[in-house]
Amino acid sequence: MRHASKSAALAIALAGPMAWAACDKPVYLTFDTGHMEVAPLIAEVLQRQAVRVTFFAANERTKVGDGSLGEHWAPWWRERAAEGHEFASHTWSHVYWRADLPGAAPRFKVQASAGAQQGLLLNWGAAEYCQQIQQAGDRLQTLTGKKPLPLYRAPGGKTSPQLLAAAKACGYAHVGWAAAGFLGDELPSDKFSNPLLLAKALRDIRSGDILVAHLGIWSRQEPWAPAVLEPLLLGLKARGFCFATLREHPAYRAWVAASG
């Protein structure tokens, strides 16, 4: 079984650009880090379905181990790189933008939701914010041996034009998600059951959409993954969709290529 698993991973990794050349109705599945308990199961589904995704990573608290970018999870990240997935920053301390601050130079009120400063409201300049993006990217490169994409996702998708301009100036383009691409794994399961979320996604997703889910959500009682993930992938394939990473996304392709 181990040999077969490695062979499948190699086949996915080697598919490369030829796989995407035939992808004329693409969607772009992305995962943000979380408590990581379901991460191994998500990886199994992605490998079984030969789907490559883009992972946005922060060093978040985990149910097992020393944080989602800690040493405990290092083998998991290396395996995903070997399978041909892409990686990008989610800010090191999972930092939420709260407000722009007045002044000539860009400054922001932010709140870390992981690490030593968790919960604190902080006033940061552009350099401090960019360092947060870069720190997660540097750690990803150490873990995976692969250069991350010059992209990032702000936690919660919370941004301002000034914040986006500051990140762009230090080399990072922001990636959000399509309205239909919000897969709902953060929503309470007593009101938004897995079958309901699956049906909504299969009904609403359109070609070109960026989709977002997480590697574990602390607050959801009925985990979204892997229960919804495989039926979603199968259902989208049956509707003629194919899957690509953000390296191939038309809005980011030139930006990624220019970064080398």
Regions picked out by a protein language model, each given a short descriptive name:
Residues 55, 87-89, 176, 213, ...:
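Hydrophobic residues in well-ordered beta-strands that form the structural core
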Residues 86-94, 157-159, 212-215:
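Histidine-centered catalytic micro-motifs
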Residues 53, 63, 221-260:
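C-terminal domain-boundary segment and adjacent tail
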Residues 1-9:
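Bacterial N-terminal signal peptides that target proteins for export
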Residues 158, 163-204, 241-252:
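His/Asp/Glu-enriched short active-site or ligand-binding loop at hydrolase and phosphoryl-transfer sites
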Residues 20-113, 117-121, 132-150:
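Active-site beta->alpha N-cap acidic-glycine motif
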Residues 16-18:
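N-terminal signal peptide c-region/cleavage motif recognized by signal peptidases
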Residues 33-38, 58-72, 95-100, 151-161, ...:
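Acidic-and-aromatic substrate-binding clefts and catalytic sites of carbohydrate-active enzymes
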